[in-house]
């Protein structure tokens, strides 16, 4: 029986949480879009990757509920709504409405909000979300092109977009242990609160959360809480959980479409060392020119014989992105580039590329969501944000990287386990 079913609001975020589940002993499969078949064999957890972070609210609710229906048919014991550790949801955002819809469908009147990921500097204290010791609203997320985060107080953010009151379980309570945390949650529920933000400053806080929430029908948060829950659920060793998803050998390509500040730095550095082509948005807009353009880019990638993987980049600076959106329309440009990456990935797979390093969960995420790849057995994590995996039934190993994470040299140089993905050689096991 399926223990945990995750409904993730973007592609790379889905892989993030899947890697945390695997690293803590739960064999995990990630599935692109709402599944139609039965549960894959040999897994304790399934992560369904949607693209609902920034779509219209009703569409986000529709897709999330469809994913929930499938999970319930598989006998899923716990549902986990996964969003980013930087929350990425304004007053007009989707986290609140999707959470409310899931609560109704699961007939539960109370749930938690736990975006913290301390290993990556995302902590919550007194209900305030911090990014590398800076308040969320004072970080680079304040200028996010799609979901600018101008408030750091999670209860206020949640109440602005959801249908109830939101309380806080402070770090001091978590420090007191499982019993104190469980009692504090019970008090909030009795007082009529619908949601509780959980502070988390360290891994121990996440472990306590996992023990307290082991039997909750619905939890919501980032990847950090998954660590605590997996340690409660896991009956397998980490090596067994990892084994199905070790990356394949063969040629690699980098597809970058995130426009975050961090990805801009990473792309700028990597292009100094590896062959790079920038995406021309104008050539992506119509289906006729897009197909021809995807073929031309594929031929260029396949013709490269460099030691490091060639890169196709749609990453743009804030100023350049604004100009593109003004000229072509934000939605139109985004969808056009996403369609290009999907065509390109399919063509590259046909051409023998087996490893895809994907930066960002939107546009490039389409690259790993091409029609030949329906899901992934998740393998060992490359970093606390980023994982490798194998895709059944199509041969391929994606390594998604969330756009806003890791230093400017993520792509190169990198530790041996990651760098192997960028070399056209056999990755280590």
Predicted stretch roles:
Residues 6-8, 29-31, 79-83, 111-115, ...:
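General beta-strand structural signal in soluble alpha/beta enzymes
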Residues 300-359:
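C-terminal structural cap/anchor segments
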Residues 353-354, 362-404, 410-411:
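Conserved, well-ordered active-site substructure
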Residues 2-44, 60-64, 114-119:
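N-terminal basic/disordered segments at the start of proteins
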Residues 419-429:
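Residue-level detector of conserved catalytic or cofactor/ligand-binding positions
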Residues 214-281:
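Acidic, glycine-rich loop-and-beta core segments that form the ion-binding/anion-interacting portion
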Residues 1-3, 60, 68-206:
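Cap/lid and interdomain-hinge subdomains that line or gate substrate/regulatory clefts
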Residues 17-19, 91-95, 122-130, 180, ...:
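Short acidic, glycine/serine/threonine-rich loops at helix termini
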């Amino acid at each position: 029986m399926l223990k945990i079913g995750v409904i993730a609001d973007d592609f790379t975020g889905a892989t993030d949480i899947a890697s945390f589940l695997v690293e803590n002993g739960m064999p995990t499969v990630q599935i692109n879009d709402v599944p139609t078949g039965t549960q894959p064999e040999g897994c304790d957890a399934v992560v369904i990757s949607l693209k609902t972070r920034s779509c219209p609210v009703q569409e986000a609710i529709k897709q999330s509920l469809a994913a929930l229906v499938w999970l319930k048919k598989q006998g899923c014991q716990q549902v986990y709504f996964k969003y980013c550790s930087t929350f990425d949801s304004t007053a007009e955002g989707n986290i609140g409405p999707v959470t409310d819809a899931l609560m109704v469908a699961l007939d539960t009147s109370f749930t938690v909000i736990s975006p913290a990921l301390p290993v990556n500097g995302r902590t919550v204290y007194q209900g305030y979300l911090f990014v590398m010791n800076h308040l969320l609203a004072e970080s680079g997320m304040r200028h996010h092109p799609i979901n600018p985060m101008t408030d750091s107080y999670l209860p206020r953010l949640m109440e602005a977009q959801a249908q109830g009151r939101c309380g806080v379980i402070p770090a001091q309570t978590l420090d007191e242990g499982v019993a104190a945390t469980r009692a504090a949650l019970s008090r909030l529920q009795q007082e009529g609160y619908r949601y509780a933000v959980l502070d988390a400053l360290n891994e121990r806080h996440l472990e306590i959360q996992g023990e307290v929430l082991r039997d909750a029908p619905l939890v919501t948060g980032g990847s950090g809480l998954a660590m605590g829950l997996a340690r409660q659920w896991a009956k397998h060793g980490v090596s067994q959980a990892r084994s199905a998803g070790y990356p394949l050998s063969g040629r690699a390509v980098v597809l970058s479409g995130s426009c975050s500040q961090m990805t801009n730095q990473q792309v700028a550095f990597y292009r100094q060392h590896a062959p790079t082509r920038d995406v021309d948005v104008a050539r992506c807009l119509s289906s006729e020119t897009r197909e021809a353009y995807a073929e031309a880019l594929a031929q260029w990638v396949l013709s490269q014989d460099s030691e490091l993987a060639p890169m196709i980049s749609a990453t743009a600076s804030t100023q350049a992105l604004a100009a593109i959106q003004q000229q072509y329309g934000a939605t139109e440009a985004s969808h056009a580039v996403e369609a290009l990456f999907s065509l390109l990935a399919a063509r590259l797979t046909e051409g023998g590329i087996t490893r895809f390093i994907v930066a960002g969960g939107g546009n490039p995420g389409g690259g790993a969501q091409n029609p030949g790849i329906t899901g992934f057995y998740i393998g060992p994590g490359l970093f606390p944000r980023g994982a490798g995996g194998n895709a059944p039934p199509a041969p391929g190993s994606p390594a998604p990287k969330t756009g806003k994470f890791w230093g400017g040299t993520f792509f190169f140089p990198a530790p041996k386990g990651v760098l192997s993905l960028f070399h056209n050689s056999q990755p280590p096991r």
